[in-house]
Regions:
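Flexible "arm" and connector segments at domain edges
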Residues: 1-51, 55-92
């Protein structure tokens, strides 16, 4: 396995973990203790931990040339466009 493959594997794992934590937060709320068990962090805290893990991998990929600031800006604009549409349709 190359270093690139290794980083891409970690990226895929972290993306899946962020998705899982995000859906738990949607289902049970951000402040609910994950799993409703004593001693567990809130869903928000666990989601933020996973997001930071993902960003750490993304920063490593940045060094490999995978991050493009222009593409990020276009994505931000696209998100804003569809956020406004969702508001117009009464979904937000």
């Amino acid at each position: 396995m190359t270093n690139e493959q290794h980083l891409l594997t970690i990226l895929a794992e972290e993306c899946a973990e962020v998705g899982q934590r995000a859906t738990k937060a949607i289902r049970f709320g951000l402040e609910d203790p994950a799993g409703a068990q004593p001693g567990f962090s809130s869903n928000k805290k666990r989601l933020l931990e996973e997001i930071n893990d993902l960003l750490a991998v993304v920063s490593l990929l940045f060094g490999e040339g995978y991050v493009n600031k222009d593409q990020q800006k276009l994505k931000h604009q696209k998100i804003e466009k569809y956020t406004q549409l969702s508001k117009k349709l009464g979904q937000l």
